[in-house]
Amino acid sequence: MTKSKVYFTDFRTKLGEGLPTKLKRLIKDAGITDIDMDNKFVAIKMHFGELGNLGFLRPNYARAVSDVVKELGGHPFLTDCNTLYPGKRKNALEHLECAWENGFTPLTVGCPILIADGLKGTDDVEVPVAGGEYIEKAKIGRAIMDADVFISLTHFKGHETTGFGGAIKNIGMGCGSRAGKKEQHNDGTPTISESKCRGCKKCQKECANNGLVFNKETKKMSINPDTCAGCGRCIGACNFDAIAFENYTAVENLNCRMAEYTKAVVDGRPTFHISLVVDVSPNCDCHAENDAPILPNIGMFASYDLLALDQACVDACMNATPIRNSQLGDNLAKKDFHDHHDHFTNSTPESEWKTCLSHAEKIGLGSRDYELVVIK
């Protein structure tokens, strides 16, 4: 069986060729020009970053991709869906304002920006999942499913629940409407350690579902299982490591659901996938802050095979040297820390990522066996 090709270039530049130009060259070498985009609507799925976060991909990278799409005769638009939790991206009006404030405007990115699931996150399409074991019909933002061609542009980084956020996370969770996101999270209810909880209520402020309750007598927080959506937002909000998923089956189920949502998005139409391993923060760009990178900047990857792409990015990260003054570096420096020999697990020990890739391969999203083609 022929290995999937993943194309890679590092962040070194030469006189006269900046990174946006180098990205254009990478995706052309990776075969994006083979897709018929003439007069087609082309969705470019990316994360605009929560307001206050500076870890997200710069608009210049999105502009490079939209320029190539237009060169090929396509009609590109940047897109994402609304979130489950408080912040600037829970409805389309605030989401667009957030994108603009973070530098994503039609002028800077060279194309329109659409919030795919509409004003309140309810404009979705139920899409059957071929071979799905967890999801029968995925709830995907309508504008994403209306597109003729789908391109993912992913900031590859760590994640407090899923270990890392790559193409599958960007597509599967990101393309789900608010109802779709809740469906993917519906097995996961974290627990709170009373001994570690300081009662600061920061987690409560981050919850959109009244899932956290403050006990006035104990001065501690607790989870309300009846209202908790299992989104994991509170885990990243806690500065004291007091909140975690102890039910690893729930995290594994989340990973599998994300893979199946991804399959619903990409099946049946031309797709292409780009991931940048840069500013590798330990947590999701959904937070209003970003901690120091846990790994050095590695480079830009592109492939038709999104699973091979995620695997290549994981492998590159595992071969990188951890940054000392970071969440990962701090953990490794602890005398009693158990080294998992896995940068993502070492950064966030309560996370789990391997089931996502294995389930994705099982349902036919791609292959984890790849050939890395290096572009100078």
Positions of PLM-derived features:
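Extended, low-polarity segments enriched in aliphatic/aromatic residues
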Residues: 2-53, 57-61, 68, 72-80, ...
